[in-house]
């Protein structure tokens, strides 16, 4: 019985530290130092939340730039079902899926002159990716320009404006946040 008291005291102490003090402290510091990020990096227009800068959305229609395909369950870009397709590179189903995506993109983008960018036909590991390369966005310019009656130059400038450079110059590549880019497109129509 004498060994039970130190064990129980240690358990209660660690429970308070790891279950109470540490979570409250990290939450408070996160809210203090990084309030926008700690609250989900929400993109707001007035009082309305339009999305998150961290999670892609399923933009459909010719007037929007399309992001990477989502492999989440039930619906595209479902944040409660994050995950990839789990199809191996050697799986014939993956080949069929990619071929179908390429055919659909070719049909939707008949004026695109180069091959379909790889990130437009392959899902990310999370299935929630919100970024594509500026080249993948530029590949879609003819379709979006035609649907919105905008010039290629206007869309090229918009892509450049919303392109983000990697934190370290030689690690990573520039990306475009599709949610922010498409919301900016909608603002052009206002």
Swiss-Prot record:
It is a single-pass membrane protein. HAMAP family: KdpC. Belongs to the KdpC family. This is Potassium-transporting ATPase KdpC subunit. Part of the high-affinity ATP-driven potassium transport (or Kdp) system, which catalyzes the hydrolysis of ATP coupled with the electrogenic transport of potassium into the cytoplasm. This subunit acts as a catalytic chaperone that increases the ATP-binding affinity of the ATP-hydrolyzing subunit KdpB by the formation of a transient KdpB/KdpC/ATP ternary complex. The chain crosses the membrane at residues 10-30. The keyword Glycoprotein does not apply. It is found in: Cell inner membrane. GO terms for cellular component: plasma membrane. It comes from Escherichia coli O9:H4 (strain HS). The lineage of its organism: Bacteria, Pseudomonadati, Pseudomonadota, Gammaproteobacteria, Enterobacterales. Keywords: ATP-binding, Cell inner membrane, Cell membrane, Ion transport, Membrane, Nucleotide-binding, Potassium, Potassium transport, Transmembrane, Transmembrane helix, Transport. Pfam families: KdpC. The keyword Lipid biosynthesis does not apply. NCBIfam families: kdpC (TIGR00681), PRK00315.1 (NF001454). The system is composed of three essential subunits: KdpA, KdpB and KdpC. One of its GO terms (molecular function) is P-type potassium transmembrane transporter activity.
């Amino acid at each position: 019985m004498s060994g039970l008291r130190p064990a129980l005291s240690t358990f209660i102490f660690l429970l308070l530290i790891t279950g109470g003090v540490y979570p409250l402290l990290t939450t408070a510091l996160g809210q203090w130092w990084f309030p926008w990020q700690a609250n989900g990096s929400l993109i707001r227009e007035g009082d309305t939340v339009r999305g998150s800068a961290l999670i892609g959305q399923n933009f459909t229609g010719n007037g929007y730039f399309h992001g990477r395909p989502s492999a989440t369950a039930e619906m595209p870009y479902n944040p409660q079902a994050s995950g990839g397709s789990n199809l191996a590179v050697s799986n014939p189903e993956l080949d069929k899926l990619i071929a179908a995506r390429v055919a659909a993109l070719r049909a939707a983008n008949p004026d695109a002159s180069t091959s379909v960018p790889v990130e437009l036909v392959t899902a990310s590991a999370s299935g929630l990716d919100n970024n594509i390369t500026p080249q993948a966005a530029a590949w879609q310019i003819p379709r979006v320009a035609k649907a919105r009656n905008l010039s290629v130059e206007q869309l090229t400038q918009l892509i450049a404006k919303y392109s983000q450079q990697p934190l370290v110059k030689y690690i990573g590549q520039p990306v475009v946040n599709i949610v922010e880019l498409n919301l900016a497109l909608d603002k052009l129509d206002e």
